[in-house]
Each structure stands twice: as structure tokens, then as C-alpha cells.
């Protein structure tokens, strides 16, 4: 067994994903999810060596109780494995401009994460609760913060500055930050290996497609543009998020239709996207089923989703200058051969030609090139953000 194991924690507002990852191989020794925090049926599910387990956490429990369960029940039952854990790695959604790389957590870092909470009000406060809980449960282990926004700090100003008064950026930090950076970093790195090119000479466009979705242009291993903005709302059509809209729609909804700003925020984040267009579901699998059955709303939602994505991919050839590959990842990107084919067919001007057999084979965790031999390359790379967090954690504590 490796002596480079890391406990990776990803704390949401009402859930906590966790895994014990081998930083050398990326394999998970333990993985699980605690959910329904604050409700009567808070519970935890986990898997060890393929064997599934489940337990109640008790009514109205939260992050602290979940971390204590992981320590006192799950890891206590695996003493040999637990003894090999070298660090606790935390996924942090928003690091603003304060954090351009992963860092060992101390009180200064905690303060910085707190100061970025206004940019990720649903996520950063939950991350801080998880950090405090992990510090209490693992007082002797170093804690590491890995930021979703850090990978995008290489973007030039022309990519991240909005065409608003510059003082809003200078005084308030209003700019494009981007998300899914850890995923885009991992798959762009893996894509270079598939292409058998040095990362510094590889230009790819990565599409991380899940309930949240973003596209990033990666030039020589560095992010040069990305679709999400100040928050995860900008960019692509997503499960329940609208992505790009005319900003004046907000004014119209408030002043003409009587919405409050809170209602508008809820509308754009939780009632729009695939769900809003289809009036059916936010789940892409349900959208594809509706499309196959001729459901008008599902068909329209699928077409808009693919069209918006194709437009973004096309536009990101501009900062790259040369395109080596398009990379699909995330739950939708890794599993929807329908969406991949539709998007690439819209991009035939760039000489994309889908190989149907390869495309259908690249599902359920399988990676590979999905285009014909005479085509510009498109591929599927299953993401592994936890591995990046584990790697960064080990690198930092062994410096």
C-alpha cells in the first residue's frame, strides 16, 4: 500500500463528499458521501474495496458529525489504511485573486477563504466548516486547500476584465474567475499524454459538462480563457443555470414583471437551463430520453445546449491560434455520445468527423479518441479532481 494517501474532502452546503486517494496512482481506497445535513434523515454512504456501506448520521447532523463518523467509524475500522494518511486535502470553490495555487491551510488562509465567501456564498462557508471540523478531528495532519479558481489565474486581462468601469475591478474585484479549474487542469494534462506531446506544446479546449458546465481554452498547459465568470452562472446552458443572457433581462423582470432580486437570482440559478427550457428535467439523461420520444421541450433544450457549447468551442480557437484537440469530461461529457456527436457535427468547419463506434465506446469511465483518423482530434477523458487534490497535498507537505 502507498504511504502517500490523502483524505480528500469536498464540502457542499448540505453534503460532504470524501475519499482516501493514493496520490501516486489516483486510486481511491475509500470513497463516500454524507448528505441531507440539517434534516431528520442525515445519512452517510461509503465504499471500501468495492463493498458498499450505509448508515444514519442521526437527525439534524452536519459537517462536524460527518467528519467525526469518518474518523471514528470508517477509518477506525481500517487502522492500517488510516495510518498511511499523510494529509487532508480540501476542494475550495473560490479563491479570488488571493490564491493562485494550492496552499497549506493556516489561520491566514482561512481568513482569505472567508474574504472570498461573497463570491461563492453557497460554497466557501461550507468549505470553512469542513476545514474546522477536519482540523479538530485530525489535529496532527496538515490541511491543504486546492482552489477551483487557481488554474484560471493565468488568464490575461483581456480574458478576465468585464467591459464595466475599471474601478469595479480595481476596488471590488469584479472580474471573470472561472470554475472547474482542477478538472480542466487534470484533463488537459491527460490529453497531452494521449496526443503524445509535451504539455507546454499542447493546445486544447476542455469541456467539463455536468449539472454545472464550463469550457476552458488551455494553451501550453495554462488557462487563457474560460466560460464561467465572477460566479458559476455565466457561460454555457447548464442543468438549472441559464448561462449567458442579456443583463437587461434582470431589470425587465424586476421592473416590468414584479420579481424581487432574490427571485431573479433563484430563477437564473435553479429554474433555468435544461430544466427551464424543457419544462421536464435538469437531468441530461431525462432530456435525451425526451428527445428520443419526440418531446418538444427536451428537443429544444438539447439543441440549445449543444449550439451554445459549439459556439464557445469555436470562439476559443481564437486565443489558442492552433487547436490540437477538444476534450470532453464531466458526467455529461464522459457519457453522452449523443451530445458529443451533435456538438462536433456543428464544428465540421474545423474538420471534426465523429467515428460513431469510437464515440459510443467512450462511456462509463472509458477514455479515448472519438473522431476519425483524418479528423481534428476530439477525445473523452474522465476527470479525477480528487487525484489532483491528493497530488498537490503531497507535493506541498514534502517540500
Curated annotation (Swiss-Prot):
Its cofactor is Mg(2+); Mn(2+). Pathway: Metabolic intermediate biosynthesis; acetyl-CoA biosynthesis; acetyl-CoA from acetate: step 1/2. GO terms for molecular function: acetate kinase activity; ATP binding; magnesium ion binding. The active site is at residue 148. Mg(2+). Can also accept Mn(2+). GO terms for cellular component: cytosol. Keywords: ATP-binding, Cytoplasm, Kinase, Magnesium, Metal-binding, Nucleotide-binding, Transferase. Substrate binds at residue 91. GO terms for biological process: acetate metabolic process; acetyl-CoA biosynthetic process. Gene3D superfamilies: 3.30.420.40. ATP binds at residues 17, 208-212, 283-285, 331-335. The keyword Protease does not apply. Mg(2+) binds at residues 10, 385. Its main location: cytoplasm. Its EC number is 2.7.2.1. It catalyses: acetate + ATP = acetyl phosphate + ADP. NCBIfam families: ackA. HAMAP family: Acetate_kinase (MF_00020). PANTHER family: ACETATE KINASE. Belongs to the acetokinase family. This is Acetate kinase. It comes from Shewanella oneidensis (strain ATCC 700550 / JCM 31522 / CIP 106686 / LMG 19005 / NCIMB 14063 / MR-1). The gene is ackA.
Amino acid at each position: 500500500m502507498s504511504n502517500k494517501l490523502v483524505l480528500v474532502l469536498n464540502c457542499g452546503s448540505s453534503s460532504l463528499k470524501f475519499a482516501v486517494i493514493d496520490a501516486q496512482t489516483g486510486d481511491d481506497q475509500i470513497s463516500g458521501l454524507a448528505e441531507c445535513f440539517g434534516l431528520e434523515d442525515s445519512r452517510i454512504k461509503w465504499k471500501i474495496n468495492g463493498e458498499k456501506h450505509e448508515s444514519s448520521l442521526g437527525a439534524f447532523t452536519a459537517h462536524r458529525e460527518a467528519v467525526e463518523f469518518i474518523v471514528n467509524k470508517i477509518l477506525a475500522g481500517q487502522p492500517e489504511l488510516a495510518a498511511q494518511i499523510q494529509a487532508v486535502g480540501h476542494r475550495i470553490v473560490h479563491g479570488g485573486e488571493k490564491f493562485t495555487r494550492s496552499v497549506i491551510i493556516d489561520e491566514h488562509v482561512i481568513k482569505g477563504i472567508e474574504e472570498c465567501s461573497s463570491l461563492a456564498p453557497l460554497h466557501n462557508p461550507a468549505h470553512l466548516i469542513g476545514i474546522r471540523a477536519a482540523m479538530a478531528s485530525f489535529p496532527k495532519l496538515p490541511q491543504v486547500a486546492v482552489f477551483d479558481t487557481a488554474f484560471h489565474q493565468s488568464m490575461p486581462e483581456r480574458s478576465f476584465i468585464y467591459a464595466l468601469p475599471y474601478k469595479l475591478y480595481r476596488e471590488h474585484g469584479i472580474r471573470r474567475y472561472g470554475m472547474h479549474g482542477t478538472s480542466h487542469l487534470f484533463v488537459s494534462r491527460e490529453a497531452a499524454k494521449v496526443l503524445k506531446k509535451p504539455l507546454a506544446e499542447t493546445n486544447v479546449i476542455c469541456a467539463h459538462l455536468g449539472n454545472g458546465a464550463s469550457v476552458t481554452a488551455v494553451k501550453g498547459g495554462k488557462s487563457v480563457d474560460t466560460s464561467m465568470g465572477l460566479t458559476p452562472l455565466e457561460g454555457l446552458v447548464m442543468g438549472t443555470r441559464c448561462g449567458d443572457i442579456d443583463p437587461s433581462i434582470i431589470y425587465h423582470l424586476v421592473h416590468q414583471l414584479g420579481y424581487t432580486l432574490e427571485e431573479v437570482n433563484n430563477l437564473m440559478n435553479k429554474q433555468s437551463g435544461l430544466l427551464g427550457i424543457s419544462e421536464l428535467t435538469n437531468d441530461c439523461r431525462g432530456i435525451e430520453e425526451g428527445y428520443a420520444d419526440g418531446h418538444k421541450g427536451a428537443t429544444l433544450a438539447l439543441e440549445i445546449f449543444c449550439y451554445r457549447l459549439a459556439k464557445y468551442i469555436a470562439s476559443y480557437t481564437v486565443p489558442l491560434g492552433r487547436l490540437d484537440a477538444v476534450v470532453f469530461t464531466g458526467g455529461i461529457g464522459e457519457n453522452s455520445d449523443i451530445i458529443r456527436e451533435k456538438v462536433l457535427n456543428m464544428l465540421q468547419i474545423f474538420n471534426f468527423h465523429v467515428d460513431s463506434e469510437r464515440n459510443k465506446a467512450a462511456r462509463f469511465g472509458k477514455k479515448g479518441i472519438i473522431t476519425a483518423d483524418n479528423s481534428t482530434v476530439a477525445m473523452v477523458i474522465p476527470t479525477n479532481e480528487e487525484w489532483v487534490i491528493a497530488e498537490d497535498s503531497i507535493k506541498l507537505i514534502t517540500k
